[in-house]
């Protein structure tokens, strides 16, 4: 193992000089051990990742934790390999940081467990496999209009505060309990409070026993936020490749991965690209996304929350992510303003799986009719705003009336939001979702007030609500 010395510290960027030309390779992990002020840990260990070889036997590195206490002249040891993290069943029920160290309060992992490098090649073309099996989520708007594929990549797009994290938590609740397989959750640059809440919720429900959690949250330096997604992915890949499992990978939030990459890029002195992003944006995204795939021995189904800065979908960060996805669930602020939750835009959300060959003729026909009706309602809204409902033809009045019921019926109570809403969450199987909307489109429930359709699960709940309102059903 070659040794070097710290010659410069600039925030999370540390320059290290090695003697005798024994330079570490790009992505190698370097370690600094130094005395700490903290009483409980008299020595601290800082891991650095090599980013650039500058010449004159100097490498520029990115720190994976705070560089407080690091000084020029300190000894640096080259570990000879990239960062490695624990893999296998030992990771289930545990919470890790970017380096694979446990950050929950349980016993530390034994030192002799298997560890894999976080930088790996994507599976080769002949190892890839595609499936056309639908993954049922129990969320009506998703299952009906933008269904998810097993082994697919799904993006949850939305601006600040429209419900991405709540939706991803509901998907974890529904799929992890119904699917019963192994899940990996990577918290990338999001709020520590949300990660803490999620951990205790999963502990209470028992789902944690089949879940590995990895966090690099908002308070971490950019190096940790940039690499923590790879840590989570490495754990998921092992279950896919070695244990031949179908794995669920949840990432909240992919935008923070890009944002951390942008910070690192600026710190390394690269020329910024469009809107100040790193020039390597597409490459970094591709390296991550190409590894999240299904092979002929196992699958990874990934559900990724993607923050949309200022609700602008043309921003390079969300726009680059779009190209890699099989299904998109778009959350819209205008729907939250109407009190429709989940605030999924039924016209903007898309899925490769919405075809008669995959979902079946009946499901496809009902979904396209729902979209046609909502599109017609959208076109008529300007006329209604200017002239009012009275100027519409009888056919258009009926379309508007049904479209409003459909729009409200696409809303639903979530299990993870019970403490906020005071109403029980609901899981609706796909068959019941299709049947409910088919009857609604046929005019079977035209006599039921619109408010009865708000925030309910199955169509039977609508009828019960209508009875409570004093309406004959």
UniProtKB/Swiss-Prot annotation:
GO terms for molecular function: ATP binding; ATP hydrolysis activity; proton-transporting ATP synthase activity, rotational mechanism. The keyword NAD does not apply. Its EC number is 7.1.2.2. One of its GO terms (cellular component) is proton-transporting ATP synthase complex. It is a peripheral membrane protein. It catalyses: ATP + H2O + 4 H(+)(in) = ADP + phosphate + 5 H(+)(out). Belongs to the ATPase alpha/beta chains family. PANTHER family: ATP SYNTHASE, ATP SYNTHASE SUBUNIT BETA, MITOCHONDRIAL. NCBIfam families: atpD. HAMAP family: ATP_synth_beta_bact. This is ATP synthase subunit beta 2. The gene is atpD2.
């Amino acid at each position: 193992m070659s040794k070097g010395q710290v010659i410069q510290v600039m925030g999370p960027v540390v320059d290290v000089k090695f003697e005798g030309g024994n330079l570490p390779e790009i992505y190698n992990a370097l370690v600094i051990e130094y005395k700490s002020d903290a009483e409980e840990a008299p020595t601290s260990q800082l891991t650095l990742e090599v980013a650039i070889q500058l010449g004159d036997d100097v490498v520029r590195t990115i720190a994976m934790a705070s560089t407080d206490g690091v000084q020029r002249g300190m000894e640096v040891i080259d570990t000879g390999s990239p960062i490695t993290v624990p893999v296998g069943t030992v990771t289930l029920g545990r919470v890790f940081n970017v380096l694979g160290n446990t950050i929950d309060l349980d016993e530390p992992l034994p030192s002799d467990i298997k560890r894999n490098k976080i930088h790996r090649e994507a599976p080769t073309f002949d190892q890839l496999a595609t499936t056309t099996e639908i993954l049922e989520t129990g969320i009506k708007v998703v299952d009906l209009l933008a269904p998810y594929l097993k082994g697919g990549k799904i993006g949850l797009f939305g601006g600040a505060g429209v419900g991405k994290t709540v939706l991803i938590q509901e998907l974890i609740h529904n799929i992890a309990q119904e699917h019963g397989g192994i899940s990996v959750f990577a918290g990338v640059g999001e709020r520590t409070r949300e990660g803490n809440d999620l951990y205790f919720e999963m502990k209470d429900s028992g789902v944690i026993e089949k879940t590995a959690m990895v966090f690099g949250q908002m308070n971490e330096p950019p190096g940790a936020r940039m690499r923590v997604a790879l840590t989570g992915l490495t754990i998921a890949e092992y279950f896919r490749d070695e244990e031949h499992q179908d794995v669920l990978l949840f990432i909240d939030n992919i935008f923070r991965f890009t944002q951390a990459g942008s910070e690192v890029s600026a710190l390394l002195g690269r020329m910024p690209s469009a809107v100040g992003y790193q020039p390597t944006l597409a490459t970094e995204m591709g390296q991550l996304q190409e590894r999240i795939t299904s092979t002929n021995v196992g699958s990874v189904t990934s559900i990724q929350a993607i923050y949309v800065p200022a609700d602008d979908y043309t921003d390079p960060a969300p726009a680059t992510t779009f190209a890699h996805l099989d299904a998109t669930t778009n959350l819209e602020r205008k729907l939250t303003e109407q009190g429709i939750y989940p605030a999924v835009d039924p016209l903007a959300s898309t899925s490769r799986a919405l075809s008669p060959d995959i979902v079946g003729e009946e499901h496809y026909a009902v979904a396209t009719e729902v979209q046609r009706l909502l599109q017609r309602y959208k076109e008529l809204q300007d006329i209604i705003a200017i002239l009012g409902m009275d100027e519409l033809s009888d056919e258009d009045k009926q379309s508007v009336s049904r479209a409003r019921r459909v729009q409200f019926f696409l809303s639903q109570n979530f299990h993870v939001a019970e403490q906020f809403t005071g109403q029980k969450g609901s899981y609706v199987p796909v068959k019941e979702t299709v049947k409910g909307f088919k009857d609604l489109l046929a005019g079977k429930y035209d006599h039921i007030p619109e408010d009865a359709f708000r925030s309910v699960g199955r169509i039977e709940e609508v009828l019960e609500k209508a009875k409570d309102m004093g309406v004959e059903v």
